A protein has these predicted regions:
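Catalytic cores of the polymerase beta-like nucleotidyltransferase superfamily
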Residues: 1-325
Length: 325
């Protein structure tokens, strides 16, 4: 129902029953308000406000959702095994709420996600991808992404990210663990931009590092070709995750090019090198530079300052080249 500038959804109070192999209800029973709130995902969403004139504004909170809201806790009205069993997507939604609001999943719910994780496979890929987008759009995406990894959900919905966990990098340049380096890059990107596409690119930019890691006796670990191999890997990822063609192409380009500005920043910048980069990146040049800034995760403040200054030089040269061309 349209009301002023918003739309109001109207639905009858109901209880739904499910079987073990589908998230579609096998039976719908119409019920009262408490019965309807009983089937909600979390107690913080199981509250209602009366709009009848004689009791307008009265809060109905049968499961102490207000207390959980104040405690910043994600709790289910029912036993979490039942709640997550009915609609397994709620497990991803719990991770999203944790990322979006900085809340914590209560222990019973967390343990239930670990037990129920395999049921996520009955959910359509489109719904899973949409929930992942929400996590990436949150203020600190790493919170939800780490929950997915620790509970075992990441292995099921995004195995290419899961295998990053526990794989060391050369400490001089990055955090030792590729997974946690990636989490830092995603969070850095979230601070720099609200654009979900850049945040997604931050998540996948090192996707090929686990399969390209080699040992160099002088340099430690190397990941030669992880940019080009990562670009190829993203074809299958985009297809599996039902990404749009535009997003898939964008992620491939950002992954392929993400080392180019970093290389320029390390070695110094020439007009011809900048021009080649601009041609390759095309309309995504600014996005690529944002990703590269996010990719600076070293704790060495002198190196951070140096790279940032060099990126500023790259930006300035791009403007100069663009004006002359």
């Amino acid at each position: 129902i349209p009301y002023e500038k918003i739309g109001i959804d109207v639905a009858a109070a109901r209880i739904e029953s499910y079987d073990d192999k589908s998230r579609k209800p096998t039976e719908v029973i119409y019920t009262d308000l408490k019965g309807d709130l009983f089937r909600r995902d979390f107690t913080i969403n199981a509250m209602a406000v009366d709009i009848l004139p004689e009791s307008f504004g009265e809060l109905h909170d049968p499961f102490s959702g207000i207390l959980d809201l104040q405690a910043k806790q994600i709790t289910t009205p029912l036993d979490p095994d039942e709640t997550f069993g009915e609609d397994p997507l709620r497990m991803l939604r719990a991770a999203y709420f944790a990322s979006q609001f900085g809340f914590e999943i209560d222990k019973k719910g967390y343990d239930s996600i670990v037990r129920q994780k395999d049921r996520i496979l009955i959910v359509s890929q489109e719904r899973i991808t949409a929930e992942l987008f929400k996590i990436l759009a949150s203020p600190k995406p790493s919170i939800g992404l780490v929950i997915l990894q620790e509970t075992g959900l990441m292995k099921l919905i995004f195995p290419e990210i899961d295998i990053m966990y526990g794989i060391d990098q050369t400490p001089e340049w990055h955090h030792k663990d590729i997974f946690f380096h990636t989490m830092q890059v995603v969070d850095n990107a979230a601070k720099l931009t609200e654009k979900m596409e850049i945040r997604f690119a931050a998540l996948v930019h090192d996707i090929a590092k686990p399969i390209t890691r080699r040992v160099d006796q002088k340099k430690g670990y190397t990941f030669h070709g992880h940019d080009a191999i990562g670009e190829k890997m993203l074809d299958k990822v985009a297809q599996r995750m039902k990404l749009s063609n535009n997003l898939g192409t964008y992620l491939k380009k950002m992954t392929l090019l993400h080392l180019r500005p970093i290389a320029l920043a390390k070695k110094g910048v020439t007009d011809s090198a900048v021009r080649r980069l601009m041609v390759a990146a095309s309309d995504e040049t600014d996005d690529l530079m944002t990703l590269c800034r996010a990719d600076i995760t070293t704790k060495n403040s002198k190196k951070v300052k140096k790279y940032m200054q060099n990126f500023e030089r790259v930006d300035e040269l791009m403007k100069n080249v663009q004006e002359r061309d």
